[in-house]
Amino acid sequence: MEALVYTFLLVSTLGIIFFAIFFREPPKVPDRGSK
């Protein structure tokens, strides 16, 4: 069960870092207005 917990923590940390960098730097993809 410990492996599952460690994997969950690792994925959560990577997700938070990814979103932090994504929101910090504006996406270079041209926005069409919808999404």
Curated annotation (Swiss-Prot):
Topology in membrane: Single-pass membrane protein
The Gene Ontology biological process terms listed for this entry are: photosynthesis
InterPro entries under this entry?
A: PSII_PsbT, PSII_PsbT_sf
Residues crossing the lipid bilayer are 3-23
Q: Does the keyword Plastid apply?
A: yes
Task: Tell me the compartments it is located in.
Answer: Plastid, Chloroplast thylakoid membrane
Q: Which UniProt keywords apply?
A: Chloroplast, Membrane, Photosynthesis, Photosystem II, Plastid, Thylakoid, Transmembrane, Transmembrane helix
Q: Name one GO cellular component term.
A: photosystem II reaction center
Asked if the record carries the keyword Membrane, the reply is yes
Which PANTHER family does the UniProt entry name for this protein?
A: PHOTOSYSTEM II REACTION CENTER PROTEIN T, PTHR36411
User: What this chain does, per the record?
Assistant: Found at the monomer-monomer interface of the photosystem II (PS II) dimer, plays a role in assembly and dimerization of PSII. PSII is a light-driven water plastoquinone oxidoreductase, using light energy to abstract electrons from H(2)O, generating a proton gradient subsequently used for ATP formation.
Q: How does it assemble?
A: PSII is composed of 1 copy each of membrane proteins PsbA, PsbB, PsbC, PsbD, PsbE, PsbF, PsbH, PsbI, PsbJ, PsbK, PsbL, PsbM, PsbT, PsbY, PsbZ, Psb30/Ycf12, at least 3 peripheral proteins of the oxygen-evolving complex and a large number of cofactors. It forms dimeric complexes.
Family (UniProt): Belongs to the PsbT family.
What protein name does the entry list?
Photosystem II reaction center protein T
